[in-house]
C-alpha cells in the first residue's frame, strides 16, 4: 500500500512539474501585453470581490461559434500576469475576455448599477453601492508588491524601472512603478474619468477601467493565424 501511495504521489508530482519545463513553448510571444495599472488592478480586485467571475468567464475557446460571438480566442499570453486567472467555461452571463471598448464608460456604469435599464432580459444583480463608495487606494502599493513576488514586473528599483521602459515603453513603465502607485491611480482616474464624477474616485470607476482594458492589448492584425496554432 505504501508503494502504491508513493507511486501515485510521484505521478501527480510529474504531472504538475513537467509542464513547467515547456512553459515558454506554450505562451505566445506577442506585443502589447502588460500588467494592470494600479486603477485597473483595484478594479480587478473589486471584480473578484463581487463574484463577477462566478457568472462570467474570460476564456474564449477556439471554436467558430465563439469567434463569431466574442472575437479571437483567448491567448495564454493575455493571462500571464493574472493571479488568479479568470478562465472557466460557466457562463450565466457572456464571456468578458474581449469586452474592452465594446461599450462606452457610461453604458458600463448604467449596466452595473441597474442592469435591466440597458439589457431588459438581464438577470444580473444591481451593484449601486459601487457608484456611492469611494475607492480605497491606501493599500494599492502593497497589492502590487504581492504580485511582484509572483513574478509580475512591477518595479521598485531603478534597474527594474529601466527594464520596464525597455520592455513596455516609458508610459507603461511609469504606471508599473510601485513607488508612485497611488499617484498613478489618481492620475488615470482623473484623466479618463470612467464614471463621469470628477470630484472623487469611486469603486465603479476602477471596475470600469478594468473592464475597458480586457482583450484590448493584442493587435491581432499584426500576426498570421498560423503563428498562434503552433502554441496550441
Feature names for model-found ranges:
Residues 2-10, 68-203, 231-232:
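Electron-transfer interface patches adjacent to heme c in soluble/periplasmic c-type cytochromes
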Residues 55, 120-127, 218-226:
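Surface-exposed patches in mature extracellular/periplasmic domains of secreted proteins
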Residues 24-48, 60-63, 67, 92, ...:
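Electrostatic cytochrome c docking/interface patches
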Residues 43, 49-58, 108, 207-211:
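The canonical Cys-X-X-Cys-His
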Amino acid at each position: 500500500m505504501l508503494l502504491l501511495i508513493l507511486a501515485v504521489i510521484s505521478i501527480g508530482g510529474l504531472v504538475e512539474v513537467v509542464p513547467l519545463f515547456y512553459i515558454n513553448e506554450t505562451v505566445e510571444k506577442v506585443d502589447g501585453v502588460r500588467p494592470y495599472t494600479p486603477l485597473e488592478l483595484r478594479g480587478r480586485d473589486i471584480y473578484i470581490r463581487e463574484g463577477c467571475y462566478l457568472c462570467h468567464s474570460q476564456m474564449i475557446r477556439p471554436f467558430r461559434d465563439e469567434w463569431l460571438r466574442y472575437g479571437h480566442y483567448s491567448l495564454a499570453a493575455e493571462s500571464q500576469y493574472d493571479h488568479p486567472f479568470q478562465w472557466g467555461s460557466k457562463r450565466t452571463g457572456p464571456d468578458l475576455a474581449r469586452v474592452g471598448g465594446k461599450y462606452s464608460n457610461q453604458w458600463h456604469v448604467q449596466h452595473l448599477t441597474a442592469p435591466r435599464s440597458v439589457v431588459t432580459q438581464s438577470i444580473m444583480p444591481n451593484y449601486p453601492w459601487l457608484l456611492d463608495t469611494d475607492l480605497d487606494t491606501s493599500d494599492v502599493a502593497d497589492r502590487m508588491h504581492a504580485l511582484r513576488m509572483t513574478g509580475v514586473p512591477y518595479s521598485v528599483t531603478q534597474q527594474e524601472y529601466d527594464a520596464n521602459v525597455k520592455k513596455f515603453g516609458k508610459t507603461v513603465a511609469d504606471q508599473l512603478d510601485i513607488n508612485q502607485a497611488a499617484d498613478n491611480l489618481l492620475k488615470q482616474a482623473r484623466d479618463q474619468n470612467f464614471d463621469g464624477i470628477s470630484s472623487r474616485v469611486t469603486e465603479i470607476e476602477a471596475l470600469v477601467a478594468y473592464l475597458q482594458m480586457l482583450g484590448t492589448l493584442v493587435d491581432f492584425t499584426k500576426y498570421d493565424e498560423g503563428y498562434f496554432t503552433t502554441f496550441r
